[in-house]
A protein has these predicted regions:
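Conserved catalytic-core motifs of eukaryotic protein kinase domains, centered on the activation segment
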Residues: 85-86, 154
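Conserved acidic catalytic loop of the alpha/beta-hydrolase fold
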Residues: 83-85, 95-112, 124, 128
Length: 183
């Protein structure tokens, strides 16, 4: 539940879109209180793009809870790639960007987008491509904690990337999914 305009309202998690590598979740709020209902109808819509790698949208539970008081909330819920059957095909950066574009289009031109950490670059790319194609873009774009230009604040991860070849990464950090998983 969430409190809207001083009224406790019910919240139901719904799957708005199901794709092989991600579910778009909507948190639908319900109330019989006419004043709270009017307030909810006028509140902005936000899409929270959660990190894909090593995280799940459940880690942003508190963020969603706080947004529900004064926003219509959607969030990406990325599927662990090892759980996606091979026949669904690969999932690359361009697929990630395309998913984000599809979600923005579905929600509509009034959407506000928040990307948290890792998805800042794909979200920026998605919005930039929408704009360059003459499509609507989100009302706002908030990118939290993600490196847009990682050269500006290099970390040990950046140093590793700069000091190793592409083939080193292919040979040392890409692993086959164990046979007991569909991916």
């Amino acid at each position: 539940s969430a409190t809207v305009n001083g009224v406790e309202v019910a919240v139901q998690e719904q799957v708005a879109v199901m794709k092989p590598f991600c579910r778009l979740l909507r948190f639908k709020r319900f109330t019989d209180n006419p004043k709270a209902l009017e307030v909810m109808k006028s509140q902005p819509t936000v899409l929270v793009v959660a990190p894909l790698s090593g995280h799940h949208s459940t880690l942003l539970r508190d963020t969603v809870k706080s947004l529900l008081h004064d926003h219509k909330v959607f969030i990406t819920d990325w599927t662990d790639a090892r759980m996606v059957p091979l026949d669904e095909g690969p999932f690359h950066l361009d697929d990630y960007v395309s998913y984000v574009q599809d979600f923005i289009r579905l929600i509509g031109p009034e959407v506000n987008v928040i990307s948290v950490c890792q998805p800042t670059v794909p979200v920026l790319a998605a919005v930039s491509l929408l704009a360059s194609g003459g499509e609507f873009t989100p009302r706002t774009l908030t990118m939290m904690g993600g490196p847009i230009d990682a050269r500006r604040s290099p970390t040990a991860v950046n140093n590793l990337a700069m000091n190793k070849s592409h083939s080193w990464f292919e040979n040392n950090v890409i692993y086959r999914v164990p046979p007991n998983y569909p991916g």
